[in-house]
Amino acid sequence: MAMAFKMATTGMRVTDECTSSFMDMKWKKVHRYIVFKIEEKSRKVTVDKVGGAGESYHDLEDSLPVDDCRYAVFDFDFVTVDNCRKSKIFFIAWSPEASKIRAKILYATSKDGLRRVLEGIHYELQATDPTEMGFDIIQDRAK
């Protein structure tokens, strides 16, 4: 698989699967969320897990490891007070306290490069524990 984009800060490359999965989520609504991971040896950002259209935010939370960093995008559909259907895409930088310092640094320095490739993100959250990215926070930010 060809690497279409290179992250300037760390030399990490984003695989085509990352961008195509994101576009499928954004435009075709076939995914509810995508979890990305960095493969340090191959210096690539890859898709770790894809949540189907019927999965929930809680499924995304459950798919994040308690001791390692990840990136995730979540497509949040909601209805406004004016009864309009809306969709907002959240980017989540997950860096739990139990993860290794090296992983935290690697994910922190690679984040902006991935964000540039994933066009159409509305909001960003950075979380070190589940309370910093709870569903109530997603709902409040989307208003």
From Swiss-Prot:
Signal sequence residues: none
Primary residence: cytoplasm
Swiss-Prot/TrEMBL GO biological process terms: actin filament bundle assembly; actin filament depolymerization
GO molecular-function terms, A-Z: actin binding
InterPro entries in the cross-refs: ADF-H, ADF-H/Gelsolin-like_dom_sf, ADF/Cofilin
Alphabetical UniProt keywords: Actin-binding, Cytoplasm, Cytoskeleton
GO cellular component: actin cytoskeleton; cytosol
One Pfam family cited in the UniProt record for this chain: Cofilin_ADF
Location in or out of the cell: Cytoplasm, Cytoskeleton
Superkingdom classification of source: Eukaryota
Upregulating conditions: By the root-knot nematode Meloidogyne incognita.
Stretches assigned to the ADF-H domain: 11-143
Tissue: Expressed exclusively in root tip meristem.
Family: Belongs to the actin-binding proteins ADF family.
Protein task: Actin-depolymerizing protein. Severs actin filaments (F-actin) and binds to actin monomers.
Name of the molecule in the record: Actin-depolymerizing factor 5
Naturally occurring in which organism (per UniProt): Arabidopsis thaliana (Mouse-ear cress)
Record lineage: Eukaryota, Viridiplantae, Streptophyta, Embryophyta, Tracheophyta
Gene giving rise to this polypeptide: ADF5
